[in-house]
Amino acid sequence: MKTLLLTLVVVTIVCLDLGDGLICYVDSKTSRTCPPGENVCFTETWCDARCSLLGKRVDLGCAATCPTAKPGVDITCCSTDKCNPFPTQKHR
């Protein structure tokens, strides 16, 4: 009986460990499991010289902490699987 209980505890711990990786989008169609220690998905958008023609530039990915916003850069962060989809661009 003790062996069965110990086996169940070990299996539970192993199963919980395997499901820890956060899944974030890294481009408009691709997502990946973040490496250990990176528990935040981010979306970073900004305008460059081609913004009026092509829309805002977009970076997606995983991070350990939410990146610090810089002037002219919008950043959103979240911590659930696939919570950072590629933003829809407004056509001009």
Curated annotation (Swiss-Prot):
Give tissue specificity per the record. Answer: Expressed by the venom gland.
InterPro entries for the chain: Snake_3FTx, Snake_toxin-like_sf, Snake_toxin_con_site, Toxin_cobra-type
- State the UniProt keywords alphabetically: Acetylcholine receptor inhibiting toxin, Disulfide bond, Ion channel impairing toxin, Neurotoxin, Postsynaptic neurotoxin, Secreted, Signal, Toxin
What is the name of this protein? Answer: Alpha-elapitoxin-As2a
- Give the Gene Ontology MF terms in alphabetical order: acetylcholine receptor inhibitor activity; ion channel regulator activity; toxin activity
Q: Which Cys-Cys disulfides exist here? A: C24-C41, C34-C62, C47-C51, C66-C77, C78-C83
Organism lineage reads as: Eukaryota, Metazoa, Chordata, Craniata, Vertebrata
Where is the signal peptide, in residue numbers? 1-21
Q: Which GO terms describe its cellular component?
A: extracellular region
**Compartments, record wording:** Secreted
Role this protein plays: Binds with high affinity to muscular (alpha-1/CHRNA1) and neuronal (alpha-7/CHRNA7) nicotinic acetylcholine receptor (nAChR) and inhibits acetylcholine from binding to the receptor, thereby impairing neuromuscular and neuronal transmission.
Show the SUPFAM superfamilies listed in the entry. Answer: Snake toxin-like
| Membership in a protein family | Belongs to the three-finger toxin family. Long-chain subfamily. Type II alpha-neurotoxin sub-subfamily.
